[in-house]
Regions:
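A generic secondary-structure signal for well-formed alpha-helical elements
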Residues: 73-76, 201
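A common structural microfeature
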Residues: 40-44, 55-57, 63, 67, ...
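Generic structural signal for buried aliphatic residues
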Residues: 66, 72-73, 291, 299
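Generic structural motif
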Residues: 49-56, 60, 66-69, 78, ...
Length: 440
């Protein structure tokens, strides 16, 4: 872009420079190339991934044949929202946990995927669609769970109209993938997805960028906002706080670029397409890179031949908010990365108080002189350096949370179950990922 275009772009956007936060620089970032095809032997839908489901009801049973997009379960509290199979095949197992909690529905895939066929719309047809028809298509097809509502980060309630919708076009988590590499090839689907979700609100649709993503994903007709700063600047909750805060009685929705792509493919191609590109990252990965896969695939199909050592933590998602799944687990519904780091089951002499040169420290309490090499990457393990401790008023939480919220007092009010104080201290604006750095 020319200097004049850059100045115009700056003036036409909301710009936020966030100083609070902390970038955890880890070894093992993915190079921008796609690895060999993964032979995906099995898949699973995990209701525990689907935020806000409290009473899942199965629609299929072991031995049932499926197509990609066949409804498998729904939540009794929102019976019209369907959760669908990512592939065609046969249900081979239903895994339950304590008190018969539904944990996984495992699927043996066909060699060639067969899809449930939905109505195909031209771009002219899309322009004339009504909100009710859009919602019905999204709910019955399996695409609706990509839309998340604030407060509390649940799957959106289709009976509520949000005051605005937000999409973050960058991820600031440790070792996060490049959205330019993941999604720039699907820009047309993203534009169609935006047309669709624009019909779901009377308010504005906000596209939130950093300096790397705004050139690729700045789309006219929507609010394009620019965020700069350390993690959690890429969290949509932080962005909502600065653009359109959630107060008592407010509802705001968010989705992701992948969610927009799924919506675009549904309306243009008439299918529920769960294919995605993810990155395999971490200091224990031989060659960190990107891979094409389908949501919910068995992680062992990829990681068994990719790890350097056996004693590792395999995480579906990022190291701050992902879930430890082991090498027999499955990729989470919302995850676009698999992180592998050393297991922290070894004890070191004097523990965290031992002065060393190779540790990352926010407070410079250890990791002597680490502040002299701010761009150094570290191989961190999962060791928490001790047991659970009481809150100590150090002021650190406030330094890593770029929001007008007092996290220490909010956490204490949550522990005390003081609902009035929670409301006053901003509980409606937060979900777990927004305060994950406080636990680092």
């Amino acid at each position: 872009l020319s200097p004049i275009e850059l100045i115009f772009q700056y003036l036409m956007s909301l710009n936020f420079n966030l100083r609070k936060g902390f970038d955890i620089k880890l070894k093992g970032r993915a190079v921008e190339e796609t690895g060999d095809h993964i032979k995906q032997s099995s898949f699973a839908i995990k209701p525990t991934d689907l935020i806000g489901i409290t009473r899942p009801k199965l629609l299929r049973h072991i031995g049932d044949e499926l197509k990609a997009g066949t409804p498998i379960l729904f939540d009794k509290l929102s019976e019209n929202v369907m959760y669908c199979s990512p592939v065609s095949g046969e249900i081979i197992d239903i895994v339950r946990g304590e008190k018969r909690t539904l944990e996984e529905i495992r699927i043996l895939p066909d060699k060639n995927i067969k899809y449930v066929k939905h109505k195909i719309f031209s771009e002219e047809d899309i322009n004339t669609l009504e909100r009710v028809e859009v919602i019905n298509c999204l709910m019955t097809s399996g695409v609706w769970p990509n839309i998340i509502q604030r407060p509390f980060g649940f799957v959106a309630d289709p009976d509520v109209k949000p005051k605005s919708i937000h999409i973050s076009f960058f991820d600031s988590h440790p070792l996060a993938p490049s959205f330019n590499f993941l999604y720039s090839k699907d820009l047309n689907y993203i534009k169609v997805g935006l047309k669709i979700i624009n019909k779901l609100t009377d308010g504005k649709v906000h596209l939130n960028h950093n300096r790397k993503s705004i050139d690729s994903f700045k789309i006219d007709g929507y609010e394009n906002n620019l965020f700069n700063g350390p993690h959690p600047a890429g969290n949509v909750g932080v962005q909502i706080h600065h653009i359109d805060p959630v107060n008592k009685g407010d509802v705001v929705w968010s989705t992701t670029p992948f969610g927009l792509i799924q919506i675009g493919k549904l309306f243009l191609n008439g299918i529920y397409d769960a294919s995605k590109t993810i990155c395999l990252v971490g200091s224990e990965v031989k060659t960190p890179k990107y891979y094409d896969c389908i949501s919910g695939f068995s992680i062992s199909d990829l990681v068994n031949s990719s790890v350097k050592n056996e004693n590792v933590r395999i995480i579906s998602g990022n190291v701050l908010t992902g879930k430890s799944v082991g090498n027999e687990g499955y990729l989470g519904f919302y995850d676009n990365m698999i992180s592998i780091i050393p297991e922290g089951d070894k004890h070191s002499f004097l523990g965290w108080i031992m002065p060393v040169m190779n540790k990352l420290s926010f407070q410079r309490a250890f990791g002597l002189l680490s502040f002299l090499t701010p761009n150094k990457e570290y191989s961190l393990d999962t060791n928490t350096n001790g047991e659970l401790r009481a809150f100590v008023q150090t002021g650190v939480f406030e330094k890593v949370l770029p929001m007008d919220i007092l996290p220490n007092y909010l956490f204490k009010s949550i522990l005390a179950q003081d609902y009035d104080e929670m409301e006053e201290l901003g509980i409606y604006e937060l979900v777990e990922e927004d305060v994950a750095l406080c636990e680092f």
